[in-house]
């Protein structure tokens, strides 16, 4: 299939349009569509006077060049024209610096304030049938008609060409099928307009990208990208060749460009001979569009937290980080480089950010972190302790599991105003809420059997008997009991989902200690999902971990630098004793971890 002229010469349109007044505006029966945004101008100026963010986007798009891609663009154009090099225009300004071309009509040119003429760092081209070069003091190109632009582009070294208005110019290029993409700003306010963007034929152009939504100059706005579809369009011979059936772009016969246009015509006659296959063009386009859509991102602050990227040489040397453990490591890196410095309850201080998500495929592996050795026995013993509904910290200490030790001391309990509480009586924490939600808590010795709501029993019953229920939730956040807990729950809510004989779990964690807590939480809820899946005769599917306040304690930073510079190993697998059918019957001996390859242990002090 023959390349289209706009594809070869990389011709785009860029514009901003507002909403225009409608008879039904504000009424219930008002109908909106893509043509709702079509207002271009009013009385020779922008209807909205000025929108600083849109101007920033316009400049970002029309000035961005990627010199590493230019050789391929140049080759494509030269091959298309069947010549070895681009002929530089000697009698016109031609910057040695690679730039984009911007093409505008006379009215648009006249609307630009004099101090901004010509548009800097761009090759300015004015399309006018009446103006001449001698009418301008500025370095600009003057063309009389659209086909002259194609001639000019064949002689220039440039990156991309952008049509920037006005309405008649847009219309002419669209009619001649000379627009590859339209970079379109939607100004979400209504203004009086007398000039409008031509209606876009949705059979010829489709929206391929939509940006974030912004506010600027008291209006919301966003940016969309239309791309020319692959539908068979009118052959560009009708645009340039000048056959009798379409004289929109006749050949010039009266100046030095005649030879150049004849070469274009000759190309069409021998199109099969000069076919070029550019399989990576779409990838290059997507890379540029990504840059455009990130125009408003603040440049990454160097050493925001006095941590230098050189501290992560191995981490940063990796081109692809697809191993699922990098979900966790990437969060740590982001927080250490860009996190907010905050004081905290413990007095240690943290770097923190808000809102992350990780997903682990339990059907493929058991996500036990490998960049440091984890205390797996402690993770399992704590989980079994939760499942039994226990609150006595001595039970774990007697098994040399010290996860809750610091939270059960006399000093810690007194700081929580739990003066009456015995040491290591942790109060109505996770296990109590899982098995006795709503029951009155007295102490760690009393028997709470058949008191409160047994949430764990209920969710297992729902999974077995009503697997499509959207109420399969387990909640540890009991507001009434928070002040009685040695430590309010960090991982507060999980929900289960059954499909196709598989069980998935999503867990929300309000407070996320990245150095110590989160690795345990990932493993614990993954094991929990395996256990519930087995007793419900299902297979484990996904564990999804949602993090709220994610933080790195200041006294963990040096240790985490070491961890981030370690390359993860393949995750291990988890095997449960298949004979266990009751969630309460599991013991530590029923869990087997196979092929746990890991780096050395990294010590970190707990901030309590």
Curated annotation (Swiss-Prot):
SUPFAM superfamilies in UniProt: Dihydrofolate reductase-like (SSF53597), Thymidylate synthase/dCMP hydroxymethylase (SSF55831)
Domain of life: Eukaryota
Sequence ranges assigned to domain DHFR in this UniProt record: 10-228
Amino acids binding dUMP: 345, 491, 509-513, 521, 551-553
Entry keyword set: Methyltransferase, Multifunctional enzyme, NADP, Nucleotide biosynthesis, One-carbon metabolism, Oxidoreductase, Transferase
UniProt GO MF annotations: dihydrofolate reductase activity; thymidylate synthase activity
InterPro entries attached to this UniProt entry: DHFR-like_dom_sf, DHFR-TS, DHFR_CS, DHFR_dom, Thymidate_synth/dCMP_Mease, Thymidate_synth/dCMP_Mease_dom, Thymidate_synth/dCMP_Mease_sf, Thymidylate_synthase
Active-site residues, as the UniProt record annotates them: 490
Amino acids binding substrate: 14-15, 31, 54, 108, 164, 170, 185
Annotated residues for binding of NADP(+): 16, 39-45, 106-108, 128-130, 144, 165-172
Region (Thymidylate synthase): 322-608
Catalytic function, reaction form: (6S)-5,6,7,8-tetrahydrofolate + NADP(+) = 7,8-dihydrofolate + NADPH + H(+); dUMP + (6R)-5,10-methylene-5,6,7,8-tetrahydrofolate = 7,8-dihydrofolate + dTMP
CDD domains: DHFR (cd00209), TS_Pyrimidine_HMase (cd00351)
UniProt-listed PROSITE patterns: DHFR_1, DHFR_2, THYMIDYLATE_SYNTHASE
GO CC terms of this entry: cytosol; mitochondrion
Entry EC no(s): 1.5.1.3, 2.1.1.45
Outcome following mutation: residue 108 to T: In strain: Isolate FCR-3, Isolate Gambia and Isolate Palo-Alto
GO terms, biological process: dTMP biosynthetic process; methylation; one-carbon metabolic process; tetrahydrofolate biosynthetic process
Protein's pathway: Cofactor biosynthesis; tetrahydrofolate biosynthesis; 5,6,7,8-tetrahydrofolate from 7,8-dihydrofolate: step 1/1
Biological role stated in the UniProt entry: Bifunctional enzyme. Involved in de novo dTMP biosynthesis. Key enzyme in folate metabolism. Catalyzes an essential reaction for de novo glycine and purine synthesis, DNA precursor synthesis, and for the conversion of dUMP to dTMP.
Extra information: K1 is from a pyrimethamine-resistant strain; FCR3 is a pyrimethamine-sensitive strain.
HAMAP family linked: Thymidy_synth_bact
Family indicated by similarity: In the N-terminal section; belongs to the dihydrofolate reductase family. In the C-terminal section; belongs to the thymidylate synthase family.
SUBUNIT field: Homodimer.
Protein name: Bifunctional dihydrofolate reductase-thymidylate synthase
Organism: Plasmodium falciparum (isolate K1 / Thailand)
Lineage: Eukaryota, Sar, Alveolata, Apicomplexa, Aconoidasida
């Amino acid at each position: 299939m023959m390349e289209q002229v706009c594809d070869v010469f990389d011709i785009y349109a860029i514009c901003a349009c507002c909403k225009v007044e409608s008879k039904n505006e504000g009424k219930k029966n008002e109908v909106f569509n893509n043509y709702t945004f079509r207002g271009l101008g009013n009385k020779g100026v922008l209807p909205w006077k000025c929108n600083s963010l849109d101007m920033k986007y316009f400049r970002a798009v029309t000035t961005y060049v990627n010199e590493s891609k230019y050789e391929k663009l140049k080759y494509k154009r030269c091959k298309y024209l069947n010549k070895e090099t681009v002929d530089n225009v000697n009698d016109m300004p031609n910057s040695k610096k690679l730039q984009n071309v911007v093409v505008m009509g006379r009215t648009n040119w006249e609307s630009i304030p004099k101090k901004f003429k010509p548009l800097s760092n761009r090759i300015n081209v004015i399309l006018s049938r009446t103006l001449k070069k001698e009418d301008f003091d500025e370095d600009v190109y003057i063309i009389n008609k659209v086909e002259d632009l194609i001639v000019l582009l064949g002689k220039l070294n440039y990156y991309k060409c952008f049509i920037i208005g006005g309405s008649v110019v847009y219309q002419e290029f669209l009619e001649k099928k000379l627009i590859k993409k339209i970079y379109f700003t939607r100004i979400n306010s209504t203004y009086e307009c007398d000039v409008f963007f031509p209606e876009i034929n949705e059979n010829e152009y489709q929206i391929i990208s939509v940006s974030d939504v912004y506010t600027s100059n008291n209006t919301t706005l966003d940016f969309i990208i239309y791309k020319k579809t692959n539908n068979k369009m009118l052959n560009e011979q009708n645009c340039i060749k000048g056959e009798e059936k379409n004289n929109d772009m006749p050949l010039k016969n009266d100046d030095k460009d005649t030879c150049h246009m004849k070469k274009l015509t000759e190309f069409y006659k021998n199109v099969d001979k000069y076919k070029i296959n550019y399989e990576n063009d779409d990838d290059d386009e997507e890379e540029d569009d990504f840059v455009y859509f990130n125009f408003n991102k603040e440049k990454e602050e160097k050493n925001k937290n006095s941590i230098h990227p050189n501290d992560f040489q191995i981490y940063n040397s990796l081109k692809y980080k697809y191993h699922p453990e990098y979900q966790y490591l990437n969060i740590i890196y982001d927080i250490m480089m860009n996190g907010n410095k905050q004081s905290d309850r413990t007095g240690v201080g943290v770097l923190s950010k808000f809102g992350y998500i990780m997903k682990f495929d339990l059907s493929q592996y058991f996500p036990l972190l490998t960049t440091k050795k984890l205390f797996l026995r402690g993770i399992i013993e704590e989980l079994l302790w939760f499942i039994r509904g226990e609150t006595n910290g001595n039970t774990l200490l007697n098994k040399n599991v010290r996860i809750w030790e610091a939270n059960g001391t006399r000093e810690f309990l007194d700081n929580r105003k739990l003066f009456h509480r015995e040491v290591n009586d942790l109060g109505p924490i996770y296990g109590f809420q899982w098995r006795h939600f709503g029951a009155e808590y007295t102490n760690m010795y009393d028997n709470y059997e058949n008191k409160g709501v047994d949430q764990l029993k209920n969710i297992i019953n729902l999974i077995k008997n009503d697997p499509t229920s959207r109420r399969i939730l387990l909640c540890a956040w009991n507001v009434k009991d928070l002040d009685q807990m040695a430590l309010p729950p960090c991982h507060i809510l999980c929900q289960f989902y059954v499909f196709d004989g598989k069980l998935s779990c999503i867990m929300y964690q309000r407070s996320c200690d990245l150095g110590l807590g989160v690795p345990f939480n990932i493993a614990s809820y993954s094991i929990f999902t395996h256990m519930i899946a087995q007793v419900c005769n299902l297979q484990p599917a996904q564990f999804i971990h949602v993090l709220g306040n994610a933080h790195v304690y200041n006294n963990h930073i040096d240790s985490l630098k070491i961890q981030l510079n370690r390359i993860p190993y393949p995750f291990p697998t988890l095997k449960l004793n298949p004979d266990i059918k009751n969630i309460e019957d599991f013991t530590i001996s029923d869990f087997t971890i196979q092929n746990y390859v890991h780096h050395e242990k990294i010590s970190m002090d707990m901030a309590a």
